Amino acid sequence: SDAEDAEELSDIAALKILKEVEGNIIIRKSYVGQDLTGLDNITSIGGLQIGTETAFATNSKLQMVSMRSLQHITGDIVVCNNQVAYVQFDNLETIDGNIIFRTSSLQSFEFPKLTTVVKDFDLQCLTSDGEPGGEITSLRIPELTKVNGRLGVNNLGKMISLEFPKLQEVGSVDFASIPIPLETLSLPELSVVNGDLNLVSSYIASDAFTSTGNNKLQEIDGLSNLSIVKGTLTISKFQVLKKLPDWSKLEQLGGLTLLRLLECSDRILDLSKVNFVPFEDNEPLISITDGTIFSKIITKEDMSQVSMFLAPSGITGSSVGIDPELNFKSIKNFKYSSNMTTDPVFQFERVYGNMEIIRGSKKGVSAPNLVSVD
């Protein structure tokens, strides 16, 4: 019970006779045990709930959440308790609902046989002060192949390695606060993303002139099997990322955002096989900004349904960069912002929407083949 005067319960060993539970197992705050040992013989449940996202559980002694024999959950796992440090489900293979964990004390997170999550997979370690938390340094879900919903892993402040070696298809990927010390990010088999794919570093802006994003990740292991990202593919704020993944198999994007990839040595961005397709209510946009520099951006010649925003020297007035060579002949909307001393030359012929060029004083731009701006 959650009542203030409820009798405390510290031992659930008597429940070891249970093999299946059709409904939900709900752990109330009157339970003061350190683990769930009495549930270790259960193979199937409707769901497991310890707290909610809006009302965290206050079981002050519960440190380990494990059900060692559990193979199948027909509903959700929801664990929202900042005391939980260890998570272990040795035999769990499928979750027909969501898996949601919120704990700022996480030290280990083990799902060695999990293959399928029908809805969302969402792990966060945000502290009560709103800062990234947890002591866990490595997260690897070795057999996971499909997440129908959102895959989110965020605010794990000490994470060094994040690996999903067999993941092939996902509803969306939301890694929106990748830790600054992360060194390994591995998604080698990922092929289909039915929404957005966000790889965004945590970011600390000290003042107007200095800032810190992830300063360890030099290469993303994988994404070379990507064929479809129906939403926007975003890679952002990785200070020492040396190269982009090989996207030679990529056929469809809803949009592309590359932001503040300051040391990326790739100079040619080849998107020649990519069809940009509207996703939900969003029209396709290619946005390459804040010091992310390419000498050539190769696309299909007809980009009349796509907008593009380029700002290759967008860092605090920098004049260092390269004006990219563009091969398309038509574009929907085109915006270019640069402080570089050279005057760019654009060879495209038609802009079907708006064209905006932002340059410093006494700086120009040339578009000798431009026929019309509608």
Language model regions located:
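Extracellular/mature segments of secreted proteins
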Residues: 269-273
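Concave beta-strand-loop units of leucine-rich repeat
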Residues: 1-8, 22-34, 44-63, 74-85, ...
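Recurring C-terminal helix/loop segment of individual leucine-rich repeat
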Residues: 10-17, 34-40, 65-69, 87-91, ...
